[in-house]
């Protein structure tokens, strides 16, 4: 039986905060939003980036009422998402071209976020998000195993004299999570 939770947050800050908290506790977590939501989330995005918490943000780019325009298709959030937060951040961004690629690349977004312990932006637009598309039937690979990144088991943790969350044990600049 699948175990998951869907939560309707009261605002963008709560949404990203819950996603980061869920990820910090071992769940694969994401939040959907659009550009104005990314603006509001940027402080939490920086927190996830600097504390190395994997989280996926699905961004349906569009101009809209909060930007003073009627909703329309745009790719207007590229710079915002590439550098969201304060300080020297550079975020991983994925760009699906159609709903079939959204289906395939969403899995990759979670694998990348966990492998590199960082926020990943999944950049769609209003056209993909709202319009009808004709695509081939989607096929899920039942043999798929999530790439959870570098995680220590309870036995691994017991064998260590001391655990340091950000210690680079393998020299690849990626620390182990618990």
Residue ranges: model-predicted function:
Residues 1-81, 93-113:
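Thiamine diphosphate
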Residues 84-87:
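Short, flexible turn/loop "capping" segments at secondary-structure junctions
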Residues 105-178:
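Flexible, low-complexity linker and terminal segments
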């Amino acid at each position: 039986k699948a175990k998951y939770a869907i939560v309707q947050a009261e605002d963008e800050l709560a949404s990203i905060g819950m996603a980061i908290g869920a990820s910090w506790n071992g769940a694969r977590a994401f939040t959907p939003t659009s550009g104005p939501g990314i603006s509001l989330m940027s402080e939490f995005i920086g927190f996830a980036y600097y504390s190395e918490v994997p989280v996926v943000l699905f961004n349906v780019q569009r101009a809209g009422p909060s930007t003073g325009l009627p909703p329309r298709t745009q790719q207007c959030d590229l710079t915002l998402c590439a550098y969201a937060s304060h300080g020297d951040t550079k975020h991983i961004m994925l760009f699906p071209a159609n709903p079939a690629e959204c289906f395939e690349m969403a899995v990759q977004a979670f694998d990348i976020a966990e492998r590199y312990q960082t926020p990943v932006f999944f950049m769609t637009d209003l056209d993909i998000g709202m319009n009808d598309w004709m695509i081939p039937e989607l096929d899920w690979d039942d043999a798929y195993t999530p790439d959870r990144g570098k995680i220590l088991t309870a036995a691994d943790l017991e064998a260590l004299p001391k655990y340091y969350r950000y210690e680079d044990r393998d020299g690849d600049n990626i620390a182990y999570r618990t």
